[in-house]
Amino acid sequence: MHPEPAPPPSRSSPELPPSGGSTTSGSRRSRRRSGDGEPPGAPPPPPSAVTYPDWIGQSYSEVMSLNEHSMQALSWRKLYLSRAKLKASSRTSALLSGFAMVAMVEVQLDADHDYPPGLLIAFSACTTVLVAVHLFALMISTCILPNIEAVSNVHNLNSVKESPHERMHRHIELAWAFSTVIGTLLFLAEVVLLCWVKFLPLKKQPGQPRPTSKPPASGAAANVSTSGITPGQAAAIASTTIMVPFGLIFIVFAVHFYRSLVSHKTDRQFQELNELAEFARLQDQLDHRGDHPLTPGSHYA
């Protein structure tokens, strides 16, 4: 006897899915596509294997490259600063020395007035020293500036080594100090002395007619003794009163500016020393990398 074949499934009755069958496999495939199939708390994939000596060598090369670029940038910054100082010194010195020479030549001395000997000596000495200081600063600027200009116009980073600004640093600072500090103080003193020389002979009082003949000596002495301060003396005293506070303000500002500049340079030096210390530490680690062998990727721990 042959067994009876099984009846075909009816279309009216839906086929039930097997327990844990295709539904489970489909959910697994969907989780695998979305990336959520991994259990929570799984460690991330390990980084690429980089040995500690290789990492130190890479850091060393980066620091060396940055150090070289920073040194070139520092040299170019010093070159541009030196050029700016020389240009400012040359312009200031030419202007102030020319004014002092014109003032000394164009001043009209009254032959009938008895000038104090100290006033004339101070005016002559101040004018001479003022012109000498500014001409010295102008000479330094004229001699050094063309060499710096020739290097700064070359579009090459290594051409900064051909500039004499590093070797002539003291001369550049001296010219800048003579032109902007000492020369300006002497110019303020020159203005005060020029006011005294120019206005001191004026003795005519307001509302009085100009005398047609020279009065006798006794009358002139009596007039001077009874009149008090003349208009010329008042003008000279007024100019001195105005100029002295400005001179003190100029000195205070110069000292404050110098202290601020020195403080800024000191901070920059400390920063460069810290960078050099970091560079020395990396160099020491690179030199002794064979003394402490480490496994790959251990520096990431």
UniProtKB/Swiss-Prot annotation:
Post-translational modification: N-glycosylated. N-glycosylation inhibits channel activity in T cells.
Site, as annotated: Confers selective permeability to Ca(2+) ions: E106
Glycosylation sites: N223
Predominant location: membrane
Effect of E106D: Markedly decreases store-operated Ca(2+) influx. Increases channel permeability to monovalent cations. Does not affect localization to the cell membrane or STIM1-mediated activation
Residue numbers on the Cytoplasmic membrane side: 1-87, 141-173, 256-301
Protein name: Calcium release-activated calcium channel protein 1
Record's compositionally biased regions (Low complexity): 18-27
Topology in membrane: Multi-pass membrane protein
Spans traversing the lipid bilayer: 88-105, 120-140, 174-194, 235-255
GO biological process terms on file: adaptive immune response; calcineurin-NFAT signaling cascade; calcium ion import; calcium ion transmembrane transport; ligand-gated ion channel signaling pathway; mammary gland epithelium development; phospholipase C-activating G protein-coupled receptor signaling pathway; positive regulation of adenylate cyclase activity
Extracellular-side segments: 106-119, 195-234
Outcome, altering P245L: In TAM2; increases activation of the Ca(2+) release-activated Ca(2+) (CRAC) channel
Outcome of mutating P40A: Generates both inward and outward rectifying CRAC currents at negative membrane potentials. Reduces the activation of CRAC channels by STIM1
Keyword Cell membrane: yes
One GO molecular-function entry: store-operated calcium channel activity
Organism in which the protein naturally occurs: Homo sapiens (Human)
Positions of the UniProt region annotated as Interaction with STIM1: 70-90, 272-292
Gene expressing this chain: ORAI1
Composition bias type Pro residues, residue spans: 1-17
